Amino acid sequence: VARRRSAGIVLYRAGDGGLEVLLVHPGGPFWAKKDLGAWSIPKGEYEPDEDPQACALREFEEETGTRLAAPELLELGAVTQRAGKEVTAWAARGDLDAAAVRSNSFTMEWPPRSGREQEFPEVDRAAWFALDEARTKLVGAQVELLDRLVERIAR
């Protein structure tokens, strides 16, 4: 079985209290009531023959509705999530209105075994978080990406 790989973008900006990062909350019934440890950087899976950086930019646009125009990307490397999925990320400096984020959607059977298909957004909301709060919101393995971001910017 090929390992599942995804690629994403850590969008960051200077906020009043220091660095802030944009995180997205997954849509759909499974995630509806989950908050701490449920948020993610905008990301998505890519095929083995696909360029991960191109995938990261495409997925960012699909999940936020915003295209990053010629961003200068800082490579943050890869982390492995609990289920074994590898996430490769790049950081980009930028700003967007988190309240205006609109993502693509997916279809699934809901409620389970009902035979009814429902459509849900890939991302139901996005928000800017200061680093300390972002660390509590992010899926565990992705916290390492924030540490790497801070290191890269400090150089």
Predicted regions and their residues:
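Non-DNA-binding regulatory cores of transcription-related proteins
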Residues: Q118-D124
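Membrane-topology and secretion signals of cell-surface/extracellular proteins
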Residues: K34-L36, S40, T66, K85-V87, ...
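N-terminal strand-loop-strand
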Residues: V1-I41, W90
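Charged phosphate-binding loop/patch that engages nucleotide di/tri-phosphates or the phosphate backbone
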Residues: L131-R155
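Active-site-adjacent beta-strand/loop module that shapes the phosphate/pyrophosphate-binding cleft
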Residues: A78-G115, A127, L149
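The catalytic Nudix box helix
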Residues: I41-L76, A130
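Short, charged/polar surface micro-motifs in flexible loops or helix N-caps
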Residues: G15-G18, G28-W31, E47-P48, A83-G84, ...
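Residues that scaffold the ATP/ADP-binding catalytic core of kinase and kinase-like folds
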Residues: K33, D49, K137
